[in-house]
Design a protein with these regions (language model features):
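N-terminal catalytic cores of secreted or lumenal carbohydrate-active enzymes
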Residues: 1-3
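Aromatic-lined carbohydrate-recognition surfaces of secreted/lumenal glycan-active proteins
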Residues: 7-17, 34-60, 97-108
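Surface-exposed cleft-lining segments at the edges of enzyme active sites
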Residues: 15-28, 74
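Alpha-helical scaffolding segments of alpha/beta enzyme cores, especially the outer helices
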Residues: 29-40, 86, 90
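Alpha-helical scaffolding within the catalytic cores
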Residues: 54-63, 82-90, 106-115
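Aromatic- and acid-rich polysaccharide-binding/catalytic face
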Residues: 59-81, 125-127
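Substrate-binding surface in catalytic domains of secreted glycosidases
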Residues: 74-100
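Substrate-binding cleft of secreted/luminal carbohydrate-active enzymes
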Residues: 98-165
Length: 165
């Protein structure tokens, strides 16, 4: 047991339905692993975990179930504002009782423009810049994107989150 209560987000097995990783073999196996991990952590007394499931288009059969998921995430790369907003709307229509997050993103429309278009992400996490094998730069969130995001009244930083004690 923890002496001081804090919260930890568990974004397990991202991009499962994409079949890029070993946990993406099939929906039944993925759900069995997710539920087994959920039950194990709960049995160990870890009641402060926030379970984040990453949705992909057309993967509803991979969803572990409302009792095992707290927040629905979406990973979006190289998409315009309209695409991001339509993805938010689609997830909201399917999982309307859950918070929705932009769990990974890169080269997407500005947060202010997404918000205006109806994408009310609970949080967002841009992937950091890097470079291609040939040395060409990959920019996922440039300075203008960050200034826009941090300049919005509805965006708060970790330092601004109220204490849960």
């Amino acid at each position: 047991a923890m002496k001081k209560k804090s919260w930890l987000g568990m974004a397990l097995s991202g991009l499962a339905a994409g079949k890029w990783f070993w946990w993406g073999k099939d929906a039944a196996s993925f759900k069995a692993i997710w539920i087994a991990m959920f039950d194990y952590f709960k049995a160990q007394g870890l009641d402060n975990l926030i379970w984040v499931w990453t949705a992909e288009t057309g993967d509803e059969d991979w969803y572990p179930g409302d009792q095992y998921v707290d927040i629905i995430g979406s990973d979006i790369y190289s998409k315009d504002v309209e695409t991001c907003a339509s993805r938010y709307v689609a997830i909201s229509a399917t999982y309307g009782n859950k918070m929705i997050t932009l769990s990974e993103c890169g080269s997407v429309g500005k947060i202010s423009e997404q918000w205006a278009a109806g994408a009310r992400w609970s949080w967002f996490m841009p992937w950091y810049d890097g470079e291609e094998e040939d040395g060409a730069p990959i920019v996922h969130a440039d300075e203008a994107w960050w200034k826009d995001a941090m300049g919005q009244s509805y965006v708060i930083t970790r330092e601004e989150v109220p204490s849960m004690e």
